[in-house]
A protein has these predicted regions:
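Conserved Class I SAM-dependent methyltransferase catalytic core
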Residues: 202-255
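Class I SAM-dependent transferase core
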Residues: 31-91
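Conserved class I S-adenosyl-L-methionine
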Residues: 92-102
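Mobile active-site "lid"/loop adjacent to the S-adenosyl-L-methionine
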Residues: 161, 167-207
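Conserved SAM-binding motif I beta-strand of class I
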Residues: 118-123
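S-adenosyl-L-methionine
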Residues: 131-160, 165-168
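Conserved SAM-binding loop of SAM-dependent methyltransferases across substrates and taxa
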Residues: 103-116
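N-terminal auxiliary segments of SAM/dcSAM-dependent transferases
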Residues: 2-48
Length: 355
């Protein structure tokens, strides 16, 4: 019998429902998957969840979720749900990939919203895969076949494997921030070796750009990519990145998130501001940001969400602080937040040949 590969293991419900391989390193966390922008019917009966985490996984700490999220998961899931409803009359998301799955809760949520027959989930960190497999085995319905593998973007995906929907949750963290060993998968990545890409490098979007370029060969013709990106800069920078990579793009979700791992991340962003002249947007005080966000409701109409994001960002203008100021505020005991964009992209039509 051929032995199953550790890097490409099918989720075996019977084998994974027991213990994590490193049980001493595991703990449980209560998390509510219901998005705060309207509780989707598909989440009924599964919230809250008691999920497995370890020292490598991002552990949500707001059970249930607050108006300002400490985790971006519900913002992403609501955006994916809106895109699915928008596309449902014309297209089905049957093959789905999740890049940078972390503890696997994005797979759980997507399986409930999209209900695809097949999901492939991957993360670069081997320690994360343990927790992801356990959570997926416990909370994804058996009708959905899930493959969990360790991979740096699409490096370990078989040639020719393609999808209708590819969702990514990748970090835009300063290169000098050493988070790979011992913190959380959502904030770590392998160093990239390539030249300067102007705005992509300036705003720490290189990893997202690499994903978009590689995803083109992994999408079916009518497929979609969905990127979750911390919006510490103008959204036009993100749309330009999509366009140069060959995609049309639109905002499908938007929200506010408290900066996690602030002791490490905020000084790193402040250093980038000093070194290359970038300007990153944080918001403070939280109470005022919460009040402003509650005054504006995210529209159900998908095509109106870009305008909503612009209006809310404009309303938050007087709360904006730089990363340098945000680091000082955090040092003094205050929390800061930033915006989060869920951006969907579809491939631009190929140019016709004159011949």
């Amino acid at each position: 019998m051929k032995r199953q590969s550790m890097d490409d293991e099918r989720s075996d419900r019977d084998g994974l429902r027991g213990h994590l391989p490193d049980e001493d390193d595991a703990s449980t966390t209560l998390v509510n998957l219901s998005p705060y922008y309207g509780h989707l019917d598909c989440f009924s009966g599964i919230c809250p969840l008691v999920v497995k985490t370890n020292r490598f996984t991002y552990a949500p700490s707001y059970p249930p979720n607050d108006q300002i999220q400490n985790t971006w998961l519900s913002i992403a899931l609501e955006g994916i749900g809106a895109l699915f409803s928008y596309c449902a009359p014309r297209a089905a998301f049957r093959q789905v990939a999740v890049i940078g799955t972390g503890n696997g809760l994005d797979v759980v949520g997507i399986s409930r919203i999209v209900r695809p027959p097949e999901i492939v989930a991957s993360d670069i960190h081997p320690g994360v895969i343990q927790a992801a497999r356990w959570n997926i085995a416990h909370y994804v319905a058996e009708e959905c076949k899930v493959t969990v593998r360790q991979s740096d973007l699409f490096t370990d995906y078989p040639a020719g494997e393609a999808f209708d929907l590819i969702y990514e949750n990748l970090p835009n963290i300063p290169d000098g921030t050493d988070l790979f060993e011992g913190i959380r998968s959502a904030s770590c990545y392998a160093p990239r070796a390539h030249g300067v890409r102007s705005a992509c490098d300036r705003y720490l979007l290189t990893l997202h750009h690499d994903f978009l370029v590689q995803a083109r060969s992994r999408l079916h013709d009518s497929g979609w990519v969905v990127c979750l990106i911390g919006g510490r800069f103008p959204v036009r920078v993100i749309h330009r990145m999509f366009r140069t990579a060959g995609y049309r793009s639109m905002v499908v979700g938007f929200g506010l998130k408290i900066q996690s791992e602030a002791d490490v991340v905020l000084p790193a962003y402040a250093a980038v501001e000093r070194e290359n002249g970038s300007s990153f947007a944080y918001y403070h005080p939280l109470e005022k940001c919460i009040s402003i966000s509650r005054e504006l409701s995210q529209p159900t109409d998908l095509l109106s969400r870009g305008g909503y994001a612009r209006r809310l960002t404009e309303r938050l203008r007087n709360c904006r602080v730089s990363a340098t100021e945000a680091a000082r505020l955090h040092h003094d005991g205050d929390s800061v937040c930033h915006t989060v964009y869920v951006i969907a992209g579809s491939m631009m039509p190929k140019e016709r040949s004159d011949g």
